[in-house]
């Protein structure tokens, strides 16, 4: 016999969608509830669902899902923990509170899914409801570990918001064995009375193996591990020799001094700079970009797959390219001493760095004379001899001027520090080194920003008499006022004043960045400020770029690794040739897809960095002291970032056993009751490694010193807890 809760769940499973109707006898038969006791429980469950307005009675004595009067909202599932999920509302209902949903009421929906949710009557001020329809799945495959129970596989996903165990039938194991890391594709999503079911799509290897883990990260974020045979076959058809027909109509820059500047280990050179003096004493500077759109034609398998990928993904040890390597590293790469097809933005500049006239934009042909690395150019900028030293130093002076102009116009000066790894032949991390951006990097960056801005302006003002042409713009909206105010309040506690008025906020934030120079909290405050900013995205609606202080901006300079740049090239060429204009709505759909894929790629890249940081720390001496900075404070512990390698870990409450602590949430600190010890965001500390967990991608530390004071921890045993502000244990 089912209890009331089980009966309610069984009833809900009978009504997966609107339109189904059952009488009481039909329900009793379907649920095999024939005994008197079962029918009583069934009747009670029906009455409960009627009262909740989940079900309603039709005029024919049948039951169906509650109809038109029920409030239906749309949102995405945030499955925060195994006991609770929230529907983050969007669209017309977004002014409502988020809707809390019990796991049984998700009806098979998972984290990130776009769903329709219906509200229950308000309970104790909470807005609760149940999922009635899954509109769009966020993902249909997961990466994790397979465990065998008899002949059946049970799969646990690495993704921390996938809380359901997935059943894999013997016929769907594809040869996978107990304990292996696999990729599983969902066959059935399950529901209130059944677990999800899947099949093994790919065996990745053993957990902890370098290649298995990196492949696992790619698979986890739906990034393909290889190109389709059809795409590779199309690429194989390209001859590799530029024909006379392909050069026709292109402006020839081959006689002009041209060079590339890239990382030392780069293979996909998608931008080059040319430089020549004109007869009138001015300078002509060309920004030449690989003409990927010449090869990637609409309607081809190559174009279809490039669009689906939308971006190259750069993990710690490998690249998952947007284009097959024959294109990205060979035919499109602007390699030295080879003719290459390009799309160019050419500007005329005076010797004092002022741009005159309109840029020339069009298809071109170049021949790179020299491939520079950033390191080589930096030595030249610092005084080393080079045949092109005068040109490089002049370009650097122009780049510095352009940067100063941007900042004076309200551009943001944030620079977050990234890390790079030195790996051995087996992928084991030997070193973690913060990347340092120098003038050589900024030189190229400023000229690429210039080209992107000029191309966006060119497209925006390029009219065919009646209307502006659609374009793929890169926009960055102003920060959300509430989030900005919260950050200003936070920064104010540390002595930084932020003016949140729209006209002053950029200058105010830049002033804060300047005052942070050399302080322990510099990197942390900058990262927090960056998080407050809106996310840049692609759209057909031209709007200003807040972070760069540009009225119009696009992505034009990296078509080997970004699909929006391919679209920008394609659109520009259509307009220059007066060819058909695309439908704006369809183009907006492409923009949305590219924005989503960009976020997914960034998440995958961060996951690979975190994994390798944890792996690196796992090999370190547990007796060594590391200098670090408190990067976060919670009631369950503090986060510390090691200064020399940017590895972040946690000192848990159980290790802060030299005192009892109150968590003062609004002051971002822990305060010891007896000692008065104050641990707050930005504090300099020394920590010692306690341990690592690769599966959870976490690092644990012992706290040894705060501001130079050595701490005396008690032996392990029953530990005091951290008490939230204002709460005390009852005597």
Locate the predicted segments by residue.
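Charged, low-complexity terminal tails
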Residues: 1-168
């Amino acid at each position: 016999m089912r209890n009331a809760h089980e009966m309610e769940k069984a009833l809900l499973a009978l009504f997966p969608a609107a339109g189904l109707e059952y009488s009481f006898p039909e329900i009793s038969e379907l649920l095999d509830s024939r005994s008197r006791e079962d029918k009583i429980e069934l009747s009670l469950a029906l009455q409960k669902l009627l009262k909740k307005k989940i079900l309603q009675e039709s005029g024919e004595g049948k039951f169906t899902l509650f109809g038109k009067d029920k409030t239906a909202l749309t949102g995405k599932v945030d499955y925060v923990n195994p006991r609770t999920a929230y529907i983050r509302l969007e669209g017309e209902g977004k002014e409502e509170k988020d809707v809390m949903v019990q796991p049984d009421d998700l009806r098979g929906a998972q984290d990130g899914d776009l769903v329709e949710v219906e509200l229950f009557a308000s309970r104790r001020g909470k807005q609760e409801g149940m999922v009635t329809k899954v509109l769009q799945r966020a993902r249909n495959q997961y990466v994790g570990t397979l465990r065998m129970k008899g002949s059946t596989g049970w799969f646990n996903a690495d993704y921390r918001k996938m809380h359901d165990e997935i059943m894999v039938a013997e016929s769907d194991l594809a040869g996978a064995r107990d304990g292996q890391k696999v990729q599983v594709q969902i066959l059935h999503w399950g529901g209130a009375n059944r677990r999800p079911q899947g099949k093994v799509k790919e065996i990745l290897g053993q957990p902890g193996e370098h290649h298995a883990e990196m492949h696992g990260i790619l698979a986890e974020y739906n990034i393909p591990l290889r190109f389709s045979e059809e795409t590779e076959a199309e690429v194989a058809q390209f001859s590799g020799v530029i024909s006379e027909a392909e050069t026709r109509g292109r402006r020839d820059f081959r006689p002009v001094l041209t060079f590339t500047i890239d990382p030392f280990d780069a293979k996909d050179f998608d931008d080059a700079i040319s430089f020549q003096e004109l007869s009138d004493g001015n300078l002509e500077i060309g920004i030449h970009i690989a003409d990927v759109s010449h090869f990637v034609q609409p309607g081809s398998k190559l174009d279809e797959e490039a669009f689906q990928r939308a971006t190259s993904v750069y993990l710690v040890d490998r690249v998952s390219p947007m284009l097959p390597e024959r294109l990205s590293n060979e035919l499109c790469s602007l390699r030295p001493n080879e003719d290459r097809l390009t799309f160019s933005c050419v500007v005329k500049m005076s010797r004092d760095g002022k741009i005159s006239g309109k840029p020339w934009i069009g298809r071109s042909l170049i021949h790179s004379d020299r491939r520079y690395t950033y390191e080589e150019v930096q030595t030249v900028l610092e005084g080393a001899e080079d045949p092109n030293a005068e040109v490089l130093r002049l370009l650097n002076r122009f780049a510095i001027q352009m940067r100063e102009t941007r900042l004076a116009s309200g551009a943001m000066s944030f620079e977050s520090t990234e890390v790079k790894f030195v790996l051995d032949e087996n992928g084991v991390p030997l070193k973690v080194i913060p990347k340092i951006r120098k003038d050589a990097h900024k030189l190229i960056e400023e000229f690429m920003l210039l080209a992107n801005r000029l191309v966006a302006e060119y497209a925006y003002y390029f009219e065919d008499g009646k209307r502006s042409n659609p374009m793929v713009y890169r926009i960055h909206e102003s920060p959300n006022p509430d989030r900005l105010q919260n950050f200003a309040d936070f920064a104010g506690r540390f002595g930084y004043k932020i003016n949140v008025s729209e006209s002053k906020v950029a200058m105010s934030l830049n002033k804060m960045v300047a005052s942070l120079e050399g302080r322990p909290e510099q990197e942390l405050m900058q990262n927090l400020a960056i998080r407050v900013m809106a996310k840049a995205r692609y759209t057909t609606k031209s709007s200003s770029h807040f972070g760069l202080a540009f009225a119009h901006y696009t992505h034009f300079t990296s078509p080997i690794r970004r699909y929006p740049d391919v679209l920008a090239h394609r659109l520009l060429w259509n307009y220059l040739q007066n060819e058909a204009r695309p439908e704006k709505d369809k183009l907006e759909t492409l923009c949305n897809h590219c924005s989503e894929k960009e976020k997914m790629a960034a998440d995958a890249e961060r996951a690979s960095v975190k994994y390798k940081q944890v792996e690196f720390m796992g090999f370190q001496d547990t007796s060594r002291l590391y200098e670090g900075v408190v990067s976060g404070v919670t009631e369950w512990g503090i986060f510390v970032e090691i200064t020399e390698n940017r590895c972040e870990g946690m000192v848990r409450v159980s290790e802060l056993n030299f005192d009892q602590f109150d968590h003062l949430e609004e002051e971002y600190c822990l305060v010891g009751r007896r000692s008065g010890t104050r641990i707050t965001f930005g504090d300099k500390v020394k920590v010692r490694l306690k341990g690592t967990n690769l599966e959870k991608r976490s690092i644990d530390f012992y706290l040894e010193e705060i501001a130079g004071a050595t701490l005396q921890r008690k032996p392990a045993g029953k530990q005091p807890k951290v008490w939230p502000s204002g709460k005390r244990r009852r005597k």
